[in-house]
Amino acid sequence: MAAVVALSLRRRFPAAALGGARLQACRGAQTAAAAAPRIKKFAIYRWDPDKTGDKPHMQTYEIDLNNCGPMVLDALIKIKNEIDSTLTFRRSCREGICGSCAMNINGGNTLACTRRIDTNLSKVSKIYPLPHMYVIKDLVPDLSNFYAQYKSIEPYLKKKDESQGGKEQYLQSIEDREKLDGLYECILCACCSTSCPSYWWNGDKYLGPAVLMQAYRWMIDSRDDFTEERLAKLQDPFSLYRCHTIMNCTQTCPKGLNPGKAIAEIKKMMATYKEKQASA
């Protein structure tokens, strides 16, 4: 019996050894494939106003995608930490909530933290600051005018009787609350406004898609008492009516919102408001 078992083992051993060799070869091939570098080029807008004689230019960096996270912001952070500490950009939450890392990536305005790196190694990823804005440095745009416009619409609840302020809740029906969906989620990243040709040419007077969508959000809030006053502020030829429904704003919004629709709704409300004023 022992001889039979030994013979059986000898017969099985060569097959087991062959299988083990195949497994090791397969694992070795996988390891080699995983270790093969995947070099990706990034051409990034650079300009430092504090550097004498410096002019806007593109600077190219190379990164091995095997050692980098999947998002464009991961690449930017890797470049700043490991290659060029002078590269300047905004970032904070890294999950599409704060809007800080808004920039133009491969021709479209979006958030660097939610935009995946194009893994086509033959293409250079091009990164610019938000278009048609003054640049503070590198990928950092000056949003002073944008924030001033946002402040001008008074983005908060306004009550004509404030005697009960802080004493009771301003209740809202489920239906009225649902009207705010698709509006309050705006993170003020300015991707939409800086993709709008009308805002490019009239940014000092036209409020732009982001601010107008926020204006609409407060106009239709059932708890707010200043809808007509808010409309009255937008009657001039520029604040609202420079929108020509190009719809770049809706196409580029990283949160999937529809500023163009909100602006159209304001125009409807404005028509009703003007009719009421004319008949008064």
Curated annotation (Swiss-Prot):
The chain's transit peptide is found over 1-28
Tell me, in a sentence or two, what this protein's role is.
Answer: Iron-sulfur protein (IP) subunit of the succinate dehydrogenase complex (mitochondrial respiratory chain complex II), responsible for transferring electrons from succinate to ubiquinone (coenzyme Q). SDH also oxidizes malate to the non-canonical enol form of oxaloacetate, enol-oxaloacetate. Enol-oxaloacetate, which is a potent inhibitor of the succinate dehydrogenase activity, is further isomerized into keto-oxaloacetate.
What pathway is this protein a component of? Carbohydrate metabolism; tricarboxylic acid cycle; fumarate from succinate (eukaryal route): step 1/1
Quote the protein name from its UniProt record: Succinate dehydrogenase [ubiquinone] iron-sulfur subunit, mitochondrial
Names of required cofactors: [2Fe-2S] cluster; [3Fe-4S] cluster; [4Fe-4S] cluster
Query: Encoded by which gene?
Result: SDHB
Cite the record's note on assembly: Component of complex II composed of four subunits: the flavoprotein (FP) SDHA, iron-sulfur protein (IP) SDHB, and a cytochrome b560 composed of SDHC and SDHD. Interacts with SDHAF1; the interaction is required for iron-sulfur cluster incorporation into SDHB.
**Binding of [4Fe-4S] cluster: at which residues?**
186, 189, 192, 253
Question: What does the note under cofactor report?
Answer: Binds 1 [2Fe-2S] cluster. Binds 1 [3Fe-4S] cluster.
Q: Which SUPFAM superfamilies match?
A: 2Fe-2S ferredoxin-like, alpha-helical ferredoxin
Q: How does it sit in the membrane?
A: Peripheral membrane protein
**Where is the 2Fe-2S ferredoxin-type domain positioned along the sequence?**
40-133
* Region entry Interaction with SDHAF1, spans: 146-218
Q: Which top EC class is named for this enzyme in its record?
A: oxidoreductase
Q: How is its activity regulated?
A: Enol-oxaloacetate inhibits the succinate dehydrogenase activity.
Hey, which family's this protein in?
Belongs to the succinate dehydrogenase/fumarate reductase iron-sulfur protein family.
Chief site of localization: mitochondrion
Q: Where does a ubiquinone bind?
A: 201
**Which cellular component appears as one GO term in the record?**
mitochondrial inner membrane
What PROSITE patterns does this protein's entry cite?
Answer: 2FE2S_FER_1 (PS00197), 2FE2S_FER_2 (PS51085), 4FE4S_FER_1 (PS00198), 4FE4S_FER_2 (PS51379)
List of residues binding [3Fe-4S] cluster: 196, 243, 249
Compartment(s) where it occurs, according to its Swiss-Prot or TrEMBL record? Mitochondrion inner membrane
User: Which residues are reported to carry the modification N6-acetyllysine?
Assistant: 51, 55
Q: Which reaction does it catalyse?
A: a quinone + succinate = fumarate + a quinol; (R)-malate + a quinone = enol-oxaloacetate + a quinol; (S)-malate + a quinone = enol-oxaloacetate + a quinol
Source species, domain of life = Eukaryota
